[in-house]
Swiss-Prot record:
Cytoplasmic side: 61-79, 135-146, 197-206
Coiled-coil annotated spans: none
Family, similarity comment: Belongs to the CDP-alcohol phosphatidyltransferase class-I family.
Keywords assigned by UniProt, alphabetized: Cell inner membrane, Cell membrane, Membrane, Transferase, Transmembrane, Transmembrane helix
InterPro entries: CDP-OH_P_trans, CDP-OH_PTrfase_TM_dom, CDP_ALCOHOL_P_TRANSF_CS
Record's GO cellular component terms: plasma membrane
Record organism: Escherichia coli (strain K12)
Residue numbers on the Periplasmic membrane side: 1-37, 103-111, 170-173
Name listed for the protein in its UniProt record: Inner membrane protein YnjF
GO terms under biological process: phospholipid biosynthetic process
Bilayer topology annotation: Multi-pass membrane protein
Compartments, as annotated in UniProt: Cell inner membrane
Keyword Ribonucleoprotein (UniProt): no
Length: 206
């Protein structure tokens, strides 16, 4: 919901940063891998209850995720880079809730499981439509900076990061955050499946 409004404002700042990073030894895929390696640290940090340390690596991961895309656009977007980026993004989004579960299994296990279950819904509907949109060459005007078709919704990347930030700042409330956000994710999944189905169905009639 917030991505399409936030990205145009952040993109100029990222472009300024990648001017410094645009060196022969630095590649978009390299930034993706470094960002993921940093993001993976959130899992042990959360499991140990080091919430502020986890917050730092989560934010660094998201910063590098923005920089790798900006550097790729400065040079050339590639299918391989887009595939690597989205694959590692989804793994990162899954490991953070798992870290909260490990931190307090009695309190967070059920809510964290609900959140991961909801992430499967948003992720599968997102990727399934992206694949078919590319096949039918459907335009993606709202997210032209993406290397694949980006089907929006109520809970997108920005909202997910806000959830993780709130969880790190108020870990005792993570279970409540997870229950509420998971419900919003299922609303997103329903709207994506329905709108995606109608869009693809209309193409068959043309």
């Amino acid at each position: 919901m917030l991505d399409r409004h936030l990205h145009p404002r952040i993109k100029p700042l990222l472009h300024q940063c990648v001017r410094v990073l645009d060196k022969p030894g630095i590649t978009p895929d390299g930034l993706t891998l470094v960002g993921f390696a940093i993001g993976v640290l959130a899992l042990p940090f959360l499991a140990l209850g080091w919430y502020l340390a986890a917050l730092v690596v989560i934010l660094l991961n998201r910063l590098l995720d923005g920089l790798d895309g900006a550097l790729a656009r400065r040079r050339e977007l590639t299918d391989a880079g887009g595939f690597l980026d989205i694959s590692l993004d989804f793994l990162f989004y899954a490991l953070v809730p798992f870290g909260f579960i490990l931190a307090a299994p009695e309190q967070n296990a059920l809510a964290g499981g609900w959140l991961l279950f909801a992430f499967i819904g948003t992720g599968s509907s997102f990727l399934a439509f992206a694949a078919l949109a590319a096949k039918h060459q459907i335009d993606n005007p709202g997210y032209a900076h993406k290397s694949f078709y980006y089907l929006g919704g109520l809970t997108e990347g920005t909202e997910t990061i806000l959830l993780f930030v709130l969880g790190c700042l108020f870990p005792a409330w993570f279970a409540w955050f997870a229950w509420i956000f998971g419900a919003l994710c299922w609303m997103t999944t329903f709207t994506r499946v329905w709108s995606g189905y109608l869009t693809l169905k209309s193409l068959q009639r043309q």
